[in-house]
């Protein structure tokens, strides 16, 4: 288990030595991983760090506004790149190809920002489970196996690459980051793209965005899951009034875990599941069916793609 009081000074020293007098940019998503990296890097190199938030169009409801507010003190640069990401994902259905398309677009946008800032280094919040899943061939992560092989940075610096998620949270508390960051539920780097099975379209993203908002609103505070979300699986037959309808199938996922390496589905009360179904199908008219995924990890991963 990590000892934050020892890890923090060593991480700051390592960042200082790797970047020296150079400038660095960081992919700041607002998650605990990137937030911890940003704070460590800021303590190491100060104003030579430029945090950048990319609005990919694949984020949760209200995400960009929330991140802009929380990190306004760090001179956060917000880059709007929704059209580029959707163009890169057009026609792509294979999960690995989707992740790699997102990874390549992600790094190219950052390269462009780095050139403007004359930054030579990219800081990333890769954690140990990301590397294990990528190296083991389970699935690539946008900041590991999904990155292009040729990049315009001297080096990628990964300060927390040997930590598990619960250890990152301990470091976040020790750094005195806001509670909202320390307790923030994991959200995948590729965003809602991996919660939309098959090709990513604006319609499917909007359904996923609204469904995720409902699921988080209903389950986070009451059940404290390690992770919970909604995914759009495809289309199925339903009934709206007395008319046959063909609408989206939404799957709800809620799991408990210590570090993300293994996970068990939460045994949610039946009345809670019924309430979720009612809210999702009534508030999102394009949804025809709601299911609850009870599969543990393994054999499944937590996310659907």
Swiss-Prot record:
Keywords annotated in UniProt: ATP-binding, GMP biosynthesis, Ligase, Nucleotide-binding, Purine biosynthesis
PROSITE patterns: GMPS_ATP_PPASE
Substrates-to-products reaction catalysed: XMP + L-glutamine + ATP + H2O = GMP + L-glutamate + AMP + diphosphate + 2 H(+)
Pfam families in UniProt: GMP_synt_C
Record carries keyword ATP-binding: yes
One GO MF term: ATP binding
GO cellular component term of the entry, any: cytosol
Binding site for ATP: 29-35
Enzyme Commission number: 6.3.5.2
Pathway(s) where this gene product acts: Purine metabolism; GMP biosynthesis; GMP from XMP (L-Gln route): step 1/1
GMPS ATP-PPase domain: residues covered: 2-184
Assembly mode: Heterodimer composed of a glutamine amidotransferase subunit (A) and a GMP-binding subunit (B).
Protein's job: Catalyzes the synthesis of GMP from XMP.
Full protein name: GMP synthase [glutamine-hydrolyzing] subunit B
Gene symbol of the encoding locus: guaAB
